[in-house]
Amino acid sequence: MQIDVDPQEDPQNAPDVNYVVENPTLDLEQYAASYSGLMRIERLQFIADRCPPLRVEALKMALSFVQRTFNVDMYEEIHRKLSEATRELQNAPDAIPESGVEPPPLDTAWVEATRKKALLKLEKLDTDLKNYKGNSIKESIRRGHDDLGDHYLDCGDLSNALKCYSRARDYCTSAKHVINMCLNVIKVSVYLQNWSHVLSYVSKAESTPEIAEQRGERDSQTQAILTKLKCAAGLAELAARKYKQAAKCFLLASFDHCDFPELLSPSNVAVYGGLCALATFDRQELQRNVISSSSFKLFLELEPQVRDIIFKFYESKYASCLKMLDEMKDNLLLDMYLAPHVRTLYTQIRNRALIQYFSPYVSADMHKMAAAFNTTVAALEDELTQLILEGLINARIDSHSKILYARDVDQRSTTFEKSLLMGKEFQRRAKAMILRAAVLRNQIHVKSPPREGSQGELTPANSQSRMSTNM
């Protein structure tokens, strides 16, 4: 008996959130420069929480970036974290006295001044919106809601920002306005990690005439919008652990129009799309949709390590492929959207490699197989046992000789079983056709009961029939 288990629903593949990265190879300045706004600050905070060696540097950078906004609460929170991280660094047994270890003092003057500015701007925007509503000018009201949403977003009040952007929907007078509203809601929903909301508004934006009715060549603006929508949908599918669907979304992104640092960078598209494709695509899909894709090749040029991993996997050089995956694992664990899925994706990629390696053979020497996967025979045997139990490999293991044998399928019995099933299906269809012919010949009419709440003549709940026989 074989057990068919969906690896994405396997409880063993639950996301691992308790991880610490001790040996990062990340260039923090270059990484932060790829993002803007709240996304940059949140990613730096995520790195600070998961990587002790980069904690102080990441928090200092986040502190300087947050001072360009009205987000006073986040400034105070980051400053508190930075003070704690600095004290931990100073109290460490192997701490080396350095200059500049002390965190900058809390800028109370900036805090007070920024709070006042934010309040004054909020009052002005609120007054303007009331005036627009008094004049009943839809376009002005829509812009007023958008401006108010932008201000709340700058202050870090995401729930109110979402409300303001959503309210603009009632005042949209064109498809362009609807798309702009959807993009604003999607952006805030990504920050809130409300993924069902993201997919809902991606669908709304794609159904607007400006996007849905265009075929063939799209103009630059439409292509940019579509790329943004596909990337947002990809993030949502990734969060839902629907990796194949996420890969398809990222593969539809256009490199020339991928410019929205408030959500993600082109490098993210390459990494997310590449790893999800490796974990879920078969050999033909990988060749057709990734390796031969002229558009996605441009993304992979930004991440040569991911590109090399994909090519090594396709060329069946699994030891090199898995070694390169391990080398970049620490950096992937510092990505706030990919980190919870790294273990699951790596497991699925390795399982797919094992399945692909064994598929052409009737038997395989597990010693050679272990060498190809850079592992021990005992560890390989455990992996293969799990794959057999899950029904992913139809084989049996000779533990004494350390040989993996493919199970022989009795083609004769299989053919007979298929023939019997087809015969039963033909009988069922023939009986249905004879019954239909008899009904038509005898002019039998069956009235269905009326639907609840429908108007017209009332008929009994049971179907009525009448038969007229031509003599």
Swiss-Prot record:
Superkingdom of origin organism: Eukaryota
Protein's name according to its UniProt entry: COP9 signalosome complex subunit 1
Gene Ontology cellular component terms for the protein in this record: COP9 signalosome; cytoplasm
Similarity section: Belongs to the CSN1 family.
Segments forming domain PCI: 249-411
Phosphoserine PTM sites in chain numbering: S448, S454, S463
Annotated compartments: Cytoplasm; Nucleus
Bias type Polar residues, positions: 456-471
Keywords tagged on the record: Cytoplasm, Nucleus, Phosphoprotein, Signalosome
Pfam families in the cross-refs: CSN1_C (PF21151), PCI (PF01399), RPN7 (PF10602)
Assembly mode: Component of the CSN complex, composed of COPS1/GPS1, COPS2, COPS3, COPS4, COPS5, COPS6, COPS7 (COPS7A or COPS7B), COPS8 and COPS9. In the complex, it probably interacts directly with COPS2, COPS3, COPS4 and COPS5. Interacts directly with inositol kinase ITPK1. Interacts with CAPN8. Interacts with USP48. Interacts with ASB4; this interaction negatively regulates GPS1.
Stored InterPro entries: CSN1_C (IPR048624), PCI_dom (IPR000717), Rpn7/CSN1 (IPR019585), Rpn7_N (IPR045135), WH_DNA-bd_sf (IPR036390)
SMART domains recorded: PINT (SM00088)
Tissue specificity remark: Expressed in the base region of the oxyntic and pyloric mucosae.
Function: Essential component of the COP9 signalosome complex (CSN), a complex involved in various cellular and developmental processes. The CSN complex is an essential regulator of the ubiquitin (Ubl) conjugation pathway by mediating the deneddylation of the cullin subunits of SCF-type E3 ligase complexes, leading to decrease the Ubl ligase activity of SCF-type complexes such as SCF, CSA or DDB2. The complex is also involved in phosphorylation of p53/TP53, c-jun/JUN, IkappaBalpha/NFKBIA, ITPK1 and IRF8/ICSBP, possibly via its association with CK2 and PKD kinases.
Phosphothreonine PTM sites in chain numbering: T459
Coiled-coil annotated residue ranges, if any: none
Region feature (Disordered): 445-471
Domain characteristics, as noted in the entry: The PCI domain is necessary and sufficient for the interactions with other CSN subunits of the complex. Mediates the interaction with CAPN8.
